[in-house]
Amino acid sequence: MEENKQRVKSIINILQLVAPGTPLREGIDNVLRAQTGGLIVLGYNEQIKSIVDGGFHINCAFSPASLYELAKMDGALILNETGSKILIANAQLVPDSSIDSIETGMRHRTAERVAKQTGSLVVAISQRRNVITLYQGNLRYTLKDIGVILTKANQAIQTLEKYKAVWNDGITNLGILEFEEVVTMSEVVHVLHSVEMVLRIKNEILSYIHELGTEGRLIRLQLTELLADLEAEAALLIKDYHQEKTQDHHQILKKLQDLANTQLLEDSDLVKLLGYPGQTSLEESVTPRGYRITSKISRVPPLIIENLINRFKTLQGVCRATINELDDVEGIGEVRAKKIREGLKRIQEHLYMSRHN
């Protein structure tokens, strides 16, 4: 799992350099359209120096036009690590020929070997196939056509909307059951499954956004709007139902996201994530602490909510508390006590109305 996270991080870092809208990508696209092919190395360290033969040092500021003109020559272009300077043009690269390569073309085989030998980012632009391939270490990534990525991103957004609707239904139903005091582990796990799927699709959309660069702004806005408050509410859900009250619920949500990236989770995985044994029955009754519901009451800060839960222990305890009992809690006066009672009543009414709509 750690290896997969590192790979994803590496891809994101690479894509930020060559995403649409960046000067480097503009230059690469110009070379692609001209069908001249090209080989670009980012970084000029001792390892790169040892495999560069010939070429001429120009050490000029990078521009898409310069890249396009210099790529017309047969040799490789050596840029600095950030791609802001062109250091060498028409360089002959001589990597170790004993390094394994899955590529068949000379340009791509050289690119793969240079990347494996030096760890530098190497961009190979195909002359005939109109393909841009990125290499870094053992990583190989082929850039897709922007139109294809946009189509996939829009499809993923539509899928996310469906799972967001599943989340909304599940969290509404859970809220009603919480007020009725009949929650079982099954309902909590069902909602966590919808969180898992939302996070899984979110990660896929983020990968498209990184590859789209400036073309992905609208997709990013849609993603932000769809996920507004969902992750914060999911963290409070975990805080409500985790066996240990002191556990860092944000850290557990992050763990859920990491797991969602690598595997489809079983019910027992989610039960264990909440601090219970994996064999715990899904029919077992569970009681919410009340963080999620009380956080919906307007103008009640987190510190006051913490004081409420510390005093009454559960959501049911808060709901049953009288105005005087609420008034006794530190930071809550008579006015705020009434607001809490009214707020809980409004939330309950809203949940029942949502279920019948």
From Swiss-Prot:
SUPFAM superfamilies: RuvA domain 2-like, YojJ-like. It is an enzyme of class 2 (transferase). This is DNA integrity scanning protein DisA. Belongs to the DisA family. It holds the Pfam family DisA-linker. Homooctamer. The gene is disA. Participates in a DNA-damage check-point that is active prior to asymmetric division when DNA is damaged. DisA forms globular foci that rapidly scan along the chromosomes during sporulation, searching for lesions. When a lesion is present, DisA pauses at the lesion site. This triggers a cellular response that culminates in a temporary block in sporulation initiation. It comes from Bacillus cereus (strain B4264). GO terms for biological process: DNA repair. It catalyses: 2 ATP = 3',3'-c-di-AMP + 2 diphosphate. Its EC number is 2.7.7.85. Residues 8-146 form the DAC domain. Keywords: ATP-binding, DNA damage, DNA repair, DNA-binding, Magnesium, Nucleotide-binding, Nucleotidyltransferase, Transferase. InterPro entries: DisA, DisA_sf, DNA_integrity_DisA_N_sf, DNA_integrity_scan_DisA_link, DNA_integrity_scan_DisA_N, DNA_integrity_scanning_protein, RuvA_2-like. GO terms for molecular function: adenylate cyclase activity; ATP binding; diadenylate cyclase activity; DNA binding. PANTHER family: DIADENYLATE CYCLASE, DNA INTEGRITY SCANNING PROTEIN DISA. ATP binds at G75, L93, M106, R107, H108, R109, T110. Its cofactor is Mg(2+).
